[in-house]
C-alpha cells in the first residue's frame, strides 16, 4: 500500500453500525446513542470535524476500542437536526481516509489520535484504462440494477479522478460490511478499482440469472393470465349467443357423479371436501390439477358395483375340464372351495395359493376359476415388487403420486368382486429396509381387508368381496403370509398328460398363431413324444410349446418358399430337420454299472430333477472333500453318510482304518448350480460304499431318502415330482423311504406303472438292491 501520511490530529470518534462512509460521500445518519449524540454536539461546537468509523459487530451498544476497525473517514457535519424522540439526524460529508493511532474515552465519548492518509496522485495510461473499463462495467451494472439512478453514471463518466470514481461506486454498491471496509483500507487507487471490478463482475452475473428467472416467471404469469382472460371471453361470448346452457359447469358434473355413486359415508365426505377445495382454486394452478386427479380416482373406484356370481358347480367343473387336462386332485379341491362359497354366499375363507413349477398352468387355472364363477379376472404380477407403496399407494404429498397397484387394478376391473390373481407371490423383494409382503397381510386377511386403506385415497375400501388367488413356484413365502393361505400343489405333468395337452391345446393354439390351416401341418403322436423325451426336460409344458411353435414357423417358411408344397407331416424320423439334434438322452441315465456313481432324485422350484453323485477314493490321510456348489445341509449329509460307512465297515468288508489312509472326494456335477437338502443321504452313502468296495452301482436305479447315523432312512418331500423326474429320465427302479409308501396312493397310476418302486427302511436294504454284488460279508 503506497501512501503518504501527514501529521496526527485529535478528533471525536463516532462509531457506525453496518455503515462505511467514503471520501466525497454525502450521507444522512440517524444517531440515538447518548455518547454518539454528545460526540456530534462536541464537533458542532468546534470545527464540525468528526471521525466516522465502522463497528466490527453491529449488535454492541457500547463498543470498546477493540470493537472498531482501524481505518475510517474524517468527515464534516453539514447539518444537524434534533428530532422529537430525542434522536439526532445529521448530514455528513466524507473528506479523507485516516488511520487511528490511539483511541480513548473522555467519559462522554471516544476521542482518537488519527493520522491522515494521502494517496499519491499518479495518472498513467493504466489508470486511464482502468477508469474507462470501470465506468463501462458500472454502466452494465446500472442497466441490470434499476435501484441506482442513472444520473450517477452521467456524473462518473465525466470524472477523471480515480479516487472519487472508486469511492462513489463503492458507496452505491450493495456490499457486505467486510467488503466495504476492504475498499476503504485499499490505499492504492488502481488496486481499489480492480477490486471493485471483480465485485461488479460477480454482481452482474447474479443479476443476469435473477433477470432470467424473473422473465420466466413473468412469462408464465402472463400465459396464465392470458388463458384466464380468454376463457372468460369465451364464456362471455357463449353467454351472449345463448350457448352457455349447453356447456355445463365441470364442478356440477363432478358433484352429480359423486351423488350417483352411492359411496360409503367416509369416502363421500372426503370427495365432497376435495371438491369444495377445487372450487376455491384457480383452474390453472398445480394444486388444482392434483385435487382434480384425486377426485377422478375416487369417482372411478368401484364402490358398489358387483357382477352376478355363478353358483353352478357342474358348469364350473365343465369349464375346468375344457381348459385343463389332468390335475384331477387340484380341480377337485377348487370345486370343493367353490361349492362352499356358493352355499355360504360369502367369500370369507382361506385364500387359495397354487404352488408348482413354471408352466404347469397356475395362472391359467386362475382364469378358469374366474370364468367358472362369472367373476371379472384381474392379475397383479408381484415379481420384483420391492416397495410397500406399490401395493398401498403413495401419499399425496409426493409429486406424481397415485393409488397402489391393488386399487389401480380394482379401478380397471370396474367391479367390487373380481377374481384377483396375485401372481408370483414368492418373487417379491424383501430385505431389512423394505418388506412389501407385510402390506399384503392386511389384503389377504378376511378379518382385516374390510377396511383396506390406500395411502393415496386416504379412506377405507372393502375388499371382502374380492376372491384372491395367489400363485408361487415354491414355499419361499413369509410365514405370516403363508398362514393366511390354503396351499394347493400342482406337480409336473406325466408324458401322457403332456401328449394330450400338446394335441388339445398347444398344437391348435400355435397353428392359429402362425396362420396355418388344419391340413397344412400334421404333427404325429410319435413326433410329440419324441419332442417331450429328447428336446424338453421340464415339469411344465412351456418348452414343449416353444418347440411346437418353432416347427410351425419353419413350416410356414417352407410353404411360402415352395408353392408346390401343400401339406407337411412331422414324425419322429424327420423331426431332426426341424428341431436339430437331440438335446437329451431319454432313458440313458447310465449305460453301464459304474463304481462310485449313483443317481439321486432332487426337488427344485421347477420340479423334480435327476442328480448324479460321484465318489472317488484315493490314497491319502483321511481328507473328506465335497464339490459341486453344495449347501450346508448336503455337506452334513455327506458327513453323516461317511460315519454310517465307518460304523458298518466290518460288515461291508472294508478295512477299519480306511478313513485314515484314504481321501474321499464326493462331487455332484453341474457345479455352477447350487444344491442343498438332506434327501440325497442314502445316495451319498451308496456312492461311498461302492467306491470303497469297488462294487458297481446298478445303472437303472435312482434313489431318494435322508439317512441317520444309525443307518435308518427318513421320509422326504416332493415324492410325486421326484418320481416324475425318474419317469422323464428313463429310470426303471426307484428306492424311496418306507414311510413315504403311503404317499404312493396320491400319485397317478400311469407314473407308478412304468417304475419299480422299493420302499426301504435302512441302508442295508438300499445297498442290497442298489449294488451289483451283495455288499455284506
UniProtKB/Swiss-Prot annotation:
Q: Which GO terms describe its cellular component?
A: cytoplasm
The residues that hold ATP are 356-363
Query: GO: which molecular function terms?
Result: ATP binding; ATP hydrolysis activity; ATP-dependent peptidase activity; sequence-specific DNA binding; serine-type endopeptidase activity
PROSITE patterns according to UniProt: LON_N, LON_PROTEOLYTIC, LON_SER
Which NCBIfam families does the protein's record reference? lon, PRK10787.1
Its quaternary organisation is: Homohexamer. Organized in a ring with a central cavity.
> What protein name is recorded for this chain?
Lon protease
* Annotated organism of origin: Buchnera aphidicola subsp. Schizaphis graminum (strain Sg)
> Source organism lineage?
Bacteria, Pseudomonadati, Pseudomonadota, Gammaproteobacteria, Enterobacterales
Amino acid at each position: 500500500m503506497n501512501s503518504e501520511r501527514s501529521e496526527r490530529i485529535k478528533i471525536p470518534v463516532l462509531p457506525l453500525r453496518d455503515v462505511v462512509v467514503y471520501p466525497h460521500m454525502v450521507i444522512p445518519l440517524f444517531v440515538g446513542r447518548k455518547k454518539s449524540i454528545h460526540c456530534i454536539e462536541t464537533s458542532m461546537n468546534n470545527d464540525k470535524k468528526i471521525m466516522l468509523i465502522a463497528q466490527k459487530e453491529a449488535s454492541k451498544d457500547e463498543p470498546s476500542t477493540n470493537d472498531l476497525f482501524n481505518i475510517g473517514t474524517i468527515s464534516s457535519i453539514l447539518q444537524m437536526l434534533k428530532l422529537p424522540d430525542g434522536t439526532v439526524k445529521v448530514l455528513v460529508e466524507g473528506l479523507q481516509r485516516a488511520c487511528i493511532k490511539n483511541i480513548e474515552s473522555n467519559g462522554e465519548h471516544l476521542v482518537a489520535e488519527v493520522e491522515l492518509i494521502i494517496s499519491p496522485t499518479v495518472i498513467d495510461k493504466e489508470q486511464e484504462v482502468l477508469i474507462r473499463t470501470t465506468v463501462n462495467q458500472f454502466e452494465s451494472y446500472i442497466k441490470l440494477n434499476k435501484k441506482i439512478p442513472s444520473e450517477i453514471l452521467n456524473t462518473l463518466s465525466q470524472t477523471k479522478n480515480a479516487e472519487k470514481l472508486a469511492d462513489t461506486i463503492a458507496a452505491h454498491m450493495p456490499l457486505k460490511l467486510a467488503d466495504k471496509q476492504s475498499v476503504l483500507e485499499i490505499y492504492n487507487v488502481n488496486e481499489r478499482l480492480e477490486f471493485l471490478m471483480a465485485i461488479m463482475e460477480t454482481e452482474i452475473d447474479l443479476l443476469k440469472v435473477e433477470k432470467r428467472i424473473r422473465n420466466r416467471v413473468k412469462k408464465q404469469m402472463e400465459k396464465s393470465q392470458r388463458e384466464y382472460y380468454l376463457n372468460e371471453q369465451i364464456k362471455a361470448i357463449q353467454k351472449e349467443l345463448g350457448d352457455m346452457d349447453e356447456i355445463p359447469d365441470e364442478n356440477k358434473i363432478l358433484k352429480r357423479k359423486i351423488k350417483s355413486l352411492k359411496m360409503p359415508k367416509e369416502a363421500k365426505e372426503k370427495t365432497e371436501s376435495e371438491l369444495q377445495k377445487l372450487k376455491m382454486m384457480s383452474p390453472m394452478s398445480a394444486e388444482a390439477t392434483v385435487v382434480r386427479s384425486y377426485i377422478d380416482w375416487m369417482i372411478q373406484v368401484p364402490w358398489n358395483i358387483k357382477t352376478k356370481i355363478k353358483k353352478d358347480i357342474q358348469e364350473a367343473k365343465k369349464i375346468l375340464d375344457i381348459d385343463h387336462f389332468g390335475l384331477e386332485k387340484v380341480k377337485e379341491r377348487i370345486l370343493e372351495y367353490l361349492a362352499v362359497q356358493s352355499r355360504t354366499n360369502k367369500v370369507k375363507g382361506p385364500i387359495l395359493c397354487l404352488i408348482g413349477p413354471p408352466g404347469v398352468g397356475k395362472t391359467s387355472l386362475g382364469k378358469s376359476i374366474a370364468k367358472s364363477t362369472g367373476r371379472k379376472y384381474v392379475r397383479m404380477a408381484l415379481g420384483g415388487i420391492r416397495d410397500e407403496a406399490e401395493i398401498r399407494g403413495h401419499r399425496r404429498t409426493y409429486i406424481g403420486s397415485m393409488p397402489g397397484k391393488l386399487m389401480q387394478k380394482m379401478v380397471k376391473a370396474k367391479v367390487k368382486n373380481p377374481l384377483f390373481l396375485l401372481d408370483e407371490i414368492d418373487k417379491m423383494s424383501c430385505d431389512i429396509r423394505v418388506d412389501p409382503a407385510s402390506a399384503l397381510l392386511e389384503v389377504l386377511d378376511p378379518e382385516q381387508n374390510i377396511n383396506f386403506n390406500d395411502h393415496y385415497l386416504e379412506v377405507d375400501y372393502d375388499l371382502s368381496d374380492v376372491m384372491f388367488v395367489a400363485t408361487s413356484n415354491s414355499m419361499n413365502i413369509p410365514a405370516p403370509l403363508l398362514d393366511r393361505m390354503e396351499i394347493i400343489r400342482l406337480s409336473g405333468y406325466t408324458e401322457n398328460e403332456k401328449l394330450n395337452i400338446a394335441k388339445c391345446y398347444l398344437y391348435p393354439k400355435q397353428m392359429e398363431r402362425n396362420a396355418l390351416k388344419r391340413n397344412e401341418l400334421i404333427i404325429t403322436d410319435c413326433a410329440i413324444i419324441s419332442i417331450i423325451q429328447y428336446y424338453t426336460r421340464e415339469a411344465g409344458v412351456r418348452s414343449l410349446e416353444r418347440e411346437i411353435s418353432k416347427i410351425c414357423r419353419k413350416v410356414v417358411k417352407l410353404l411360402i418358399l415352395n408353392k408346390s408344397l401343400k401339406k407337411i407331416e412331422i414324425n419322429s424320423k424327420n423331426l431332426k430337420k426341424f428341431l436339430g439334434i437331440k438335446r437329451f438322452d431319454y432313458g440313458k441315465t447310465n449305460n453301464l454299472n459304474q463304481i462310485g456313481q449313483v443317481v439321486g432324485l432332487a426337488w427344485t422350484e421347477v420340479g423334480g430333477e435327476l442328480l448324479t453323485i460321484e465318489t472317488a477314493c484315493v490314497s491319502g490321510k483321511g481328507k473328506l472333500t465335497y464339490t459341486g456348489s453344495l449347501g450346508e445341509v448336503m455337506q452334513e449329509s455327506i458327513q453323516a453318510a461317511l460315519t454310517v460307512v465307518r460304523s458298518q465297515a466290518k460288515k461291508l468288508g472294508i478295512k477299519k482304518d480306511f478313513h485314515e489312509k484314504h481321501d474321499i472326494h464326493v462331487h455332484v456335477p453341474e457345479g455352477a448350480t447350487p444344491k442343498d437338502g438332506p434327501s440325497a443321504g442314502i445316495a451319498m452313502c451308496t456312492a461311498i460304499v461302492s467306491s470303497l468296495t469297488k462294487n458297481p452301482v446298478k445303472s437303472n436305479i435312482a434313489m431318494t431318502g435322508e439317512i441317520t447315523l444309525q443307518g435308518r432312512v427318513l421320509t422326504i418331500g416332493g415324492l410325486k415330482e421326484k418320481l416324475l423326474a425318474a419317469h422323464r429320465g428313463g429310470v426303471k427302479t426307484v428306492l424311496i423311504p418306507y414311510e413315504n409308501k403311503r404317499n404312493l396312493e396320491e400319485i397317478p397310476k400311469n407314473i407308478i406303472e412304468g417304475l419299480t418302486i422299493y420302499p426301504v427302511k435302512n441302508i442295508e436294504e438300499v445297498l442290497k438292491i442298489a449294488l451289483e454284488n451283495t455288499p455284506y460279508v
